[in-house]
Amino acid sequence: MKFLPYIFLLCCGLWSTISFADEDYIEYRGISSNNRVTLDPLRLSNKELRWLASKKNLVIAVHKSQTATLLHTDSQQRVRGINADYLNLLKRALNIKLTLREYADHQKAMDALAEGEVDIVLSHLVTSPPLNNDIAATKPLIITFPALVTTLHDSMRPLTSPKPVNIARVANYPPDEVIHQSFPKATIISFTNLYQALASVSAGHNDYFIGSNIITSSMISRYFTHSLNVVKYYNSPRQYNFFLTRKESVILNEVLNRFVDALTNEVRYEVSQNWLDTGNLAFLNKPLELTEHEKQWIKQHPNLKVLENPYSPPYSMTDENGSVRGVMGDILNIITLQTGLNFSPITVSHNIHAGTQLSPGGWDIIPGAIYSEDRENNVLFAEAFITTPYVFVMQKAPDSEQTLKKGMKVAIPYYYELHSQLKEMYPEVEWIQVDNASAAFHKVKEGELDALVATQLNSRYMIDHYYPNELYHFLIPGVPNASLSFAFPRGEPELKDIINKALNAIPPSEVLRLTEKWIKMPNVTIDTWDLYSEQFYIVTTLSVLLVGSSLLWGFYLLRSVRRRKVIQGDLENQISFRKALSDSLPNPTYVVNWQGNVISHNSAFEHYFTADYYKNAMLPLENSDSPFKDVFSNAHEVTAETKENRTIYTQVFEIDNGIEKRCINHWHTLCNLPASDNAVYICGWQDITETRDLINALEVEKNKAIKATVAKSQFLATMSHEIRTPISSIMGFLELLSGSGLSKEQRVEAISLAYATGQSLLGLIGEILDVDKIESGNYQLQPQWVDIPTLVQNTCHSFGAIAASKSIALSCSSTFPEHYLVKIDPQAFKQVLSNLLSNALKFTTEGAVKITTSLGHIDDNHAVIKMTIMDSGSGLSQEEQQQLFKRYSQTSAGRQQTGSGLGLMICKELIKNMQGDLSLESHPGIGTTFTITIPVEISQQVATVEAKAEQPITLPEKLSILIADDHPTNRLLLKRQLNLLGYDVDEATDGVQALHKVSMQHYDLLITDVNMPNMDGFELTRKLREQNSSLPIWGLTANAQANEREKGLSCGMNLCLFKPLTLDVLKTHLSQLHQVAHIAPQYRHLDIEALKNNTANDLQLMQEILMTFQHETHKDLPAAFQALEAGDNRTFHQCIHRIHGAANILNLQKLINISHQLEITPVSDDSKPEILQLLNSVKEHIAELDQEIAVFCQKND
């Protein structure tokens, strides 16, 4: 049973909670206030009293945006805070029940007021009452001011700054323009939470915070007591807290205003002080009671000049901007909030009281002035608001006594009123007047003074901050306390009355709090420069004068030393320069005195001789071992003219440098020495040994060139004769053949002789080309396994007719082992043998020519071929043998025969390339023997040489051949040769015409001259290969050099043949094309099967369709290009559509795809490059189709 009451209470609580959950508000259970402040009874009218008696309960709405300092709930759901204390006072003053409801936001509370659910809305802090015709606002219950906050350690930061700073705020209060008035370059960071904003300043992320003084001070008191500090209050924009009622609730509004009026500044201060440790400005809620005259004076004097002493902490200090700080700075800040007066500081360097001597209007107020009856005649004093005792300051020592001793030096500021009194109390002490007490602390610490008279607050601050372990203070007995107040010019009694009213409104506790705040303020630095600047300037001036005079004396002493050093340096520089200049010369130079001794030389002189022979070079020139003994044989005979004109004597001779004799061009000249009567010789030489050798070598080469020119002229004369002779014979035979008087046998003989003469002419040209190949290094040997006896026998057999015609016995014998092969180039070996055999038969008129061949073994795989060619001809003298193997040279007997004089030279070089040797033995009138020895590899396999039956040459049928040559005769000859072989031939006069014909018609072979106008054969071949043409191409050239053939093959020719082109050569190469005629043409793009199906295999109709397609596309495509360029989109699409349609009929897939892409691509400036690319693709594709159409039409004619 004992648990029933608790169960009942729990159920009631749950029911009430559920009921609150169904509403838009939470109803508080009461007001919790421990404030014992009482108000005087309100003077209410009978009507107001009757209304309150009938009302009995006032429902007041608040909302969650109220800060904890103003209103918050405890664990019992009772409200606490500054507003709660005011509501508790309202409850007691009106003797009425109050019901508090909390709404989610301000708007819902106002809606409840409008609907009559509540009687009053207690607003949050706003800058002005709401503008609503249905709502009435009372006088402000709370007034707050913007507060500037920074870190405790940086409390002396300037209160205004043009520099960039970071400033935090909450909910955009205060506005940007207000902040920028003091900090024009501020970066403003807005927070939604006050704690985060203050924490950002404490952590150093921001420099300042600006916000409401009540809320900010409450948060600092709770969480940032030791890190943040309020350094200034601003007069605007202020924030207010109102009671809001309905417009018709006139009586309620009047009652609430009477309550607000009853809240004196003292009551407000006491209520706020219960919640704030600092920043309580509640005593400013009601303005000062100023007379109209005082208000008018403030309007006329809004700005006042303040004489400020920066060296009187904690009363008065300045920051870097010169603003007044310290206790007096905070008091002036409060007076500004009370009166609107602005204070401009004027700094006094030494003694603030000296300001009283300024001219009238030079100052308006002195803060922190110590009252003195003597000075009251000059200035007005406000009522004292700080009193502090006087103290003695002395050095701290173990045996320190709190008294003054005889003979002590004691400093006292001259403006202290107890100066005369202390002199009477301590006559044995030496009293020293000072301008400033703060500056004298350091002198006491240094022992310059024994004691100092100061106020207790000033002494406490200075010792605690600067001399905690060096100084201490004690009270001066029997003297009155110092009274601090404000001083004014005697002509400003109104200002005195205004300041007195403002000071009286400040609670004494607030003055004590400000004093304690600055005494405990850390890290405040006092700039004492002005106190010591005069002494510093005096000492500095004397030091500068002393240093300057010393420097002048030093300069005077060092001037002569420097001058000597400069002269010495110039001399050393000249010597060094001359030495470097001499050593940098590539040619040797040296100096010889009048006695002939070498007194100086450069490095090239020393390096020219060997180390041992250098000693001889340094000997006097008269010494016989000196290499220059002949230089000065007449040196002393130099005339006066030589001395004046500096004539340079040169002579060329040879000297020994220790290794060899060198030829030099030596020079010398005379140099007079002005400082003495003596003279020296400056000498040198240039080595011209190489130059002399080069000139000699050039002379030799010049003679060789002259001889070569003569030999070449002789060769040209010989060659012109050798070439002219067979050409004349050919022309003579042709002339005979053109007539009709020859019989058939004579004609055959004439043709045969003309052909043989032409072959000899080709052989002559071949010899010249062989020489060029050999000398250029392009002749390549191609060794093969060869049966040497058989090769020699066949070669001899070919010369049998010539030997028989001259009745010369030609024999060929061999001791070669049977069944042996040797590895050798058969063509080169045969050429050597043929040349030597031809010469032997040429120069032998009777007798015999013998050829013997043998093989000398070296080992199993190597041997040496030895072959001799012996004739019984005219023989050669020794002089002729010396010239025999030289180019273009012929013997006297040879010049009587035809020949180029190159044969033996070619033989010599070919044998040399085969690592062999060619020698001769000859005697005039007896004969000549040539001996050849060639090292070779041998094979012991059985050699089987079978005569291969000549394979019949099979020529291809139906070849379509194109000839390109600019020479009509060459085209006619080649065309007749091909016609003779049964082929149809087409002609082109240059490469351009040939390229066009190939593009329009199919050919199986192109034979082109390499040298043609407009486009030569090489360029024609490159163009065709760039079109991926596989057409066989033969090049024809009259230039028989190998590089010409290589050039043709490199540009893509299949063959490069040399003119003249014989029928046998043509047959041989044409036989390799025998498969061409049997290969069916391949079509990459034409669909022949589709064409056959659409035309019932009618070849004529197929050709007509293809020719029509070719004709129409060649009209439409250029028209499309022109339309695109002109911007005629309609014509452009018509042309493309026709091409697309024709491609569909012939089933040309690639052309279908490209034309379709062109049709669907919109024509614009952006797409124009893409369309041009597609049109070029169509153009290239149609060119390929033209070739295939030409092939089809040609094959089906």
Curated annotation (Swiss-Prot):
The modification Phosphohistidine is found at H721, H1137. It is an enzyme of class 2 (transferase). Activation requires a sequential transfer of a phosphate group from a His in the primary transmitter domain, to an Asp in the receiver domain and to a His in the secondary transmitter domain. Residues 347-537 are periplasmic. It is a multi-pass membrane protein. Its main location: membrane. It is found in: Cell inner membrane. Residues 718-938 form the Histidine kinase domain. Residues 22-325, 559-1197 are cytoplasmic. The keyword Coiled coil does not apply. The chain crosses the membrane at residues 326-346, 538-558. Gene3D superfamilies: 1.10.287.130, 3.40.50.2300, Histidine kinase-like ATPase, C-terminal domain, HPT domain, Periplasmic binding protein-like II. SMART domains: HATPase_c, HisKA, HPT, PBPb, REC. PROSITE patterns: HIS_KIN, HPT, RESPONSE_REGULATORY. Keywords: ATP-binding, Cell inner membrane, Cell membrane, Kinase, Membrane, Nucleotide-binding, Phosphoprotein, Signal, Transferase, Transmembrane, Transmembrane helix, Two-component regulatory system. Its EC number is 2.7.13.3. The modification 4-aspartylphosphate is found at D1009. GO terms for cellular component: cytosol; outer membrane-bounded periplasmic space; plasma membrane. One of its GO terms (molecular function) is ATP binding. Residues 960-1074 form the Response regulatory domain. Residues 1098-1197 form the HPt domain. Member of the two-component regulatory system EvgS/EvgA. Phosphorylates EvgA via a four-step phosphorelay in response to environmental signals. This is Sensor protein EvgS. It comes from Escherichia coli (strain K12).
